[in-house]
């Protein structure tokens, strides 16, 4: 896919922390229950740590028990891209930032109403902007 923000690996390595680079650019996953934003309950907006695109609102964040920040929907349609992920012997749907292609996490069909979806997102993929 072509993304609005398109940088070389060298540039991403300069701009991101090693953990952010591993997750956002190499499709890594942080350990459950360790992310800085996992327990965050402040009101505000969650943006892509790589490009600053607005992705999720605290209004749709909920405690899923998964160990990662979980949301039942993005702030609006089109801010995340979905693609099939068959890694690690599993069939999942990967979530990417639609502006820079950064790996955010995965979406599952076991979330609460009104969507029934659980966007399971790595804390390192996000930055929080408090209201």
From Swiss-Prot:
Active site feature: 120 (nucleophile)
Pfam families for the chain: SelR
Cofactor stoichiometry and binding remark: Binds 1 zinc ion per subunit. The zinc ion is important for the structural integrity of the protein.
Domain MsrB span(s) in chain numbering: 9-131
Top-level enzyme category: oxidoreductase
Enzyme Commission designation: 1.8.4.12
Binding of Zn(2+), residues: 48, 51, 97, 100
PANTHER family attached to this UniProt entry: METHIONINE SULFOXIDE REDUCTASE, METHIONINE-R-SULFOXIDE REDUCTASE B1
Protein name per the record: Peptide methionine sulfoxide reductase MsrB
Species of origin: Leptospira interrogans serogroup Icterohaemorrhagiae serovar Lai (strain 56601)
